[in-house]
Design a protein with these regions (language model features):
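Hot-dog-fold acyl-thioester-processing enzymes
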Residues: 1-75, 136
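HotDog/MaoC-like acyl-thioester-processing domains
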Residues: 1-13, 86-136
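Generic detection of short hydrophobic beta-strand segments and adjacent strand-loop junctions
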Residues: 14-20, 81, 127-129
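Hydrophobic alpha-helical context, especially transmembrane and signal-peptide helices
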Residues: 47, 52, 81, 110, ...
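Mid-chain, well-packed structural core segment of small domains
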Residues: 67-95
Length: 136
C-alpha cells in the first residue's frame, strides 16, 4: 500500500475477533500481570455492579492488531485510544478503521474503533502512520 493510493475516507478491512471468554481473561491476567479480580471473579464483578469485564488493555491490543494489519507496526508513529464502554465475556469485537487525513511526508491519520456485534463502540482511537511513496 502506497501513500498515493490512499484517500481520505478510505476504510481498512474489518478485523473480526472471537467472542471474549472467561478463560481468555484469566490467561490475559497471567500474561499482563493485571490480576484485578474485576476481570476474573464473578462475586467481585457483581459487587461492583458490572459483572466481570474484560481488561481494557486487551481491547486496546485488539485495536492495535487491527491498525498493524493495515500499516506495518514499524510505521505506526502514534496510537491513542479512549475507552467508551466496558466489554464483557460473551461479546465479539470487531475492529474497523478509516483514513481521516493525509499529511505531508507520507503520513496518514486514521480512526480505529472496537465495537461489539450490536454496534456499541467499546473503544475509539486515533493513529498516525507513515506509508511508502511510489516516488521513493
Amino acid at each position: 500500500m502506497y501513500y498515493e493510493e490512499i484517500n481520505v475516507g478510505d476504510s481498512f478491512p474489518t478485523l473480526q475477533k472471537d467472542e471474549i471468554t472467561r478463560v481468555q481473561l484469566v490467561k490475559y491476567a497471567g500474561a499482563s500481570g493485571d490480576f484485578n479480580p474485576l476481570h476474573t471473579v464473578e462475586e467481585v464483578g457483581e459487587q461492583a455492579g458490572t459483572g466481570i469485564i474484560a481488561h481494557g488493555m486487551l481491547i486496546m491490543g485488539m485495536a492495535a492488531q487491527g491498525v498493524t494489519t493495515w500499516i506495518p507496526r514499524k510505521n505506526v508513529k502514534k496510537f491513542q485510544v479512549r475507552f467508551k464502554k466496558m466489554t464483557k465475556p460473551g461479546e465479539s469485537i470487531e475492529i474497523t478503521g478509516k483514513v481521516l487525513e493525509k499529511k505531508e511526508n507520507n503520513i496518514i491519520v486514521g480512526e480505529v474503533l472496537a465495537m461489539n456485534s450490536e454496534g456499541e463502540v467499546k473503544l475509539a482511537g486515533i493513529f498516525e502512520g507513515v506509508l511508502p511513496s511510489k516516488n521513493d
